[in-house]
Amino acid sequence: MGLQQIAYRSENAGGYMADGYARISNLPGIVTAQNGPAATLLVAPLAEALKASVPLIALVQDVNRSETDRNAFQEFDHIALFASCTKWVRRVTEASRVEDYIDQAFVAACSGVPGPVALMLPADLLLEAAPKAKRLSALGYFPLDRIGRFVSWTPTRRVEFRDPGRKQLGRPGYKE
């Protein structure tokens, strides 16, 4: 799956753009955000995606790991902020685990009832080189051959409720 970056002017606009992309493409939408007040602008689009069961992945920059819980500039408790408007929220603390957390984010967003997830990435972690993981047969804890099932989250069959005694309204091509 290739990623194309599209610029936006505010995080809430980016969140709604990712939501729209996910709805029309049948793939999870991805949005990025700065830490602090900018990250709070993602709450509304993530809440909408949660209620509409749209898979979104929010990658949010966090403060440096050494500055966590020290009242750093624009430091927020992002875990608490996103807990009520996402299915899953985590903070990466080691560069060697970035790939695992990205995999888990995709699986969490696309499996079960689809919905938004948030992943916090400390600013200093983004500057570190991450070792390339050897990918033989696993995507996080899921086999690689299963990921297609999670990414294509829209039902392929239409479900129809039939009542022989009633007219079937709203069904395309229905004739009495």
Regions found by a protein language model. Name each.
Residues 1-176:
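N-terminal alpha/beta PP-like core and its mobile active-site loop of ThDP/TPP-dependent enzymes
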